[in-house]
Amino acid sequence: MSDKILFRSGEATVFAKPGQFTDAMPEILIGDVSGPVGQAFANMMGQTAGHTRMFAIRACNQMVKPATMMVPKVTIKNSKMIELFGGVVQAGTADAIVDCLIENILPRDQANNLCIISLVWIDPQTLTDPNLDLKDMYRTNYEATKLAVTRAMRNEPSVEELIAKRHTMKHEMYDPAA
């Protein structure tokens, strides 16, 4: 059996194709069910108005392993957002987790002892976009989830990388030097 994984974190952003609001920005925690991530996972089983949590499932009766709890970063206000969260976003998230097992990014021998918390973003503009591309929304959530899990399991970025890029990389939404 591989070493026990106590606490890993990762994030990724995958941008939508032009003209879409389907950017995906999951933030991931991975850890053993007996540790702090497991405790947080158990505490999230209760529901909060507007922030419904869901297990990542591939299809009915096919919950992924490690057990993965999806939590929206935005308030779920209507049935369309529920459909996106529990449909295309859930499918992309679930498929990414299973593919991480297939590709040995997540250790198969710990699949029943790990849990994952995935904070997911759904841009409210998707609700009124008449040209919403669900395939692009699936793609961005799949790719971003897989990348976030990979980064978590590889402890990326390293401290050295963060220090080296401190003054060369800028936040996409705010540049204090501008």
Indicate residue ranges for each PLM-predicted region.
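Accessory interaction regions appended to the cores of large information-processing enzymes
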Residues: M1-A178
